[in-house]
Amino acid sequence: MSTTDAAIPQPNPHATAEQVEAALKDSKLAQVLYHDWEAETYDDKWSISYDKRCVDYARDLFDATVPAEEQRRLPYEHALELGCGSGFFLLNLIQAGVARRGSVTDLSPGMVKVAIRNGESLGLDVDGRVADAEGIPYDDDTFDLVVGHAVLHHIPDVEKSLREVVRVLKPGGRFVFAGEPTTIGNGYARNLSTLTWRVATNATRLPGLGGWRRPQAELDESSRAAALEAVVDLHTFDPADLERMAHSAGAVEVSTQTTEFTAAMLGWPLRTIEAMVPPGKLGFGWAKFGFTSWMTLSWIDDNLWRRAVPKSWYYNVMITGVKPS
């Protein structure tokens, strides 16, 4: 059963032009507006589910980061997700047997509400609250595990947030953050996404292809949200620099892993096309093609390219560390 620790403010899923303008000068306001806007469609946008596919994916990320001897001692009793979004990482890790119960936090009220709703639908023991990652509203030594997926690059002061993570962990507790963009990977992903958007936009203006384009009102709203994306995406990371930050925050047993090289080169163009095409237009065949192709390239990246490609060239970096006992 899921509960909230405190009343969650009302989300604002449709920011006005004036609010967007104000958010361009305030990164935390931008985080709230952007992620409130995305909250109700976030799972569809990123093909997130809470079935075996994503349960296995989340567990694979965890297992790739955490030492095998610690995996044999699972589950953790109480886990926190920082920047929970729709709850993808923690809810699927709980289902995978990593933790018994969880707390979800996000700066966006909309995301917290969706994450709690998802937890309720799964029958999981999850509570949640709106929270700033630079000032986590929990007591010292509260959690056995802290996790996050694609959150650190949104936080203005990453090292300050990691210090907060170490503070709320129990002695010997572990953190695992996955899905963070590397500096090199982010560069090629952004360029591929921009090129795909331009080509696809021009193609849907051709005779007979207008039905493959979302209504202009939706695209205009997407443009307002996209204007905030440059404000909310604050950092990219070199794996070695991220490790140094975690050490400076007081963590020990720090290590990083990277994932997705050619898989990211395919995944970003596919996601860009999905963002501009009306929902349901591409069909199951497209989804199956995208997932199967991405899985194949991910295997190649992990088992072949890793022997020759530098760690920092991969798109995603994951980091783990432990609070000293």
Label each residue range with its predicted role:
Residues 225-241:
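Acceptor-substrate binding/catalytic loop of class I
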Residues 262-303:
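C-terminal helical/coil "lid" or tail adjacent to the Rossmann-like core of SAM-dependent
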